[in-house]
């Protein structure tokens, strides 16, 4: 039976999670497990493999080079990060279809909160009223997906003004807090998890919920 671990990890340093993610693939291959991590990051700018930015800091916020696709973005407290470490070969999911599923996980989640959102062809992510509310960046390694998506919930959007988010100088960012008056974070997590199971067809998987992580 296919297995998936949902890990609710709270606020984490990006560099630590990035390191664990790289090492985790070997563990997953040995145990035939899929992982979905829900967390937040301390303030950090991350570069995709399409960027050539050479500074180590922007206004005292660290800049970290990564191996994911896409351009520079910002992560900080109040932004829901969801990492997908999935055996896409076993699941028979192509990268284009995975992006489609991730977009629809967020679109469906936002719909629960009466927020109308949509995707744009050739511009991965989710948008509300021509502003971006969710960014997506992935990498495929040894048949597994790495990285995932970032959903702006209730955060400081100002650092985005120092960069061209996702490589587009015309993109404006938005967040759930600016669209509805009350955000129930427990319901948000529940909707995200339920939609992950739905769109990634995991309802018949063996599912575990964990709140810690280690390399085994």
From Swiss-Prot:
UniProt cross-references to PANTHER family, sorted A to Z: LIPOYLTRANSFERASE 2, MITOCHONDRIAL-RELATED (PTHR10993:SF7), OCTANOYLTRANSFERASE (PTHR10993)
Cellular compartment(s): Cytoplasm
GO biological process, one term: protein modification process
Active site (catalytic residues): 166 (acyl-thioester intermediate)
NCBIfam families per the UniProt record, alphabetical: lipB
Pathway: Protein modification; protein lipoylation via endogenous pathway; protein N(6)-(lipoyl)lysine from octanoyl-[acyl-carrier-protein]: step 1/2
Tree of life domain: Bacteria
GO cellular component, one term: cytoplasm
Protein name as catalogued: Octanoyltransferase
Name of the gene this protein is made from: lipB
Residue ranges annotated for the BPL/LPL catalytic domain, each copy included: 30-204
CDD domains the UniProt entry points to: LipB (cd16444)
Annotated binding of substrate, by residue: 68-75, 135-137, 148-150
Function recorded in the entry: Catalyzes the transfer of endogenously produced octanoic acid from octanoyl-acyl-carrier-protein onto the lipoyl domains of lipoate-dependent enzymes. Lipoyl-ACP can also act as a substrate although octanoyl-ACP is likely to be the physiological substrate.
Keywords from the UniProt entry: Acyltransferase, Cytoplasm, Transferase
UniProt main location, coarse: cytoplasm
GO molecular function terms listed in the Swiss-Prot or TrEMBL record: lipoyl(octanoyl) transferase activity
Gene3D superfamilies per UniProt: Bira Bifunctional Protein, Domain 2 (3.30.930.10)
More info: In the reaction, the free carboxyl group of octanoic acid is attached via an amide linkage to the epsilon-amino group of a specific lysine residue of lipoyl domains of lipoate-dependent enzymes.
UniProt source species: Wigglesworthia glossinidia brevipalpis
EC number(s) on file: 2.3.1.181
Family designation: Belongs to the LipB family.
UniProt site (Lowers pKa of active site Cys): 132
Catalysed transformations (reactions): octanoyl-[ACP] + L-lysyl-[protein] = N(6)-octanoyl-L-lysyl-[protein] + holo-[ACP] + H(+)
Cysteines paired by S-S bonds: none
